[in-house]
């Protein structure tokens, strides 16, 4: 269950929902929240997640922010990234891609689409990796209220494993 964990309406800028495998190897819903403040380009991380994936996202964000928008000045702001485990699953196995999208949303002051769930991950070099357990992850996302899924192209080959009733 978990209906309503991904609420209707546009989220505030810097807030994204992601589906990742938790410590118990179950697809779990997480919310990433970014707070952007005037500063010098520092990152503070809180919540039940490994700092390494967030550091990769932040380093990529700082290196490539101008490719997203010329108005992003990563060195003129500090960012606080907080992860909320919405289903009690513990630390997620992936969080880099969703963290990057949350950082961009927060820095631009623009929300992501309503009821969006982000899947997949990203390497330091920007390579997007596929979603693990695609069918289960989609089911969890839809049960939680997601109406839109951001899915890596690298997961397209797994679409035939998804039951038709999920589409």
Predicted features and spans:
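Peripheral, non-AAA+ core regions of ATP-driven protein-machinery
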Residues: 2-18, 23-167
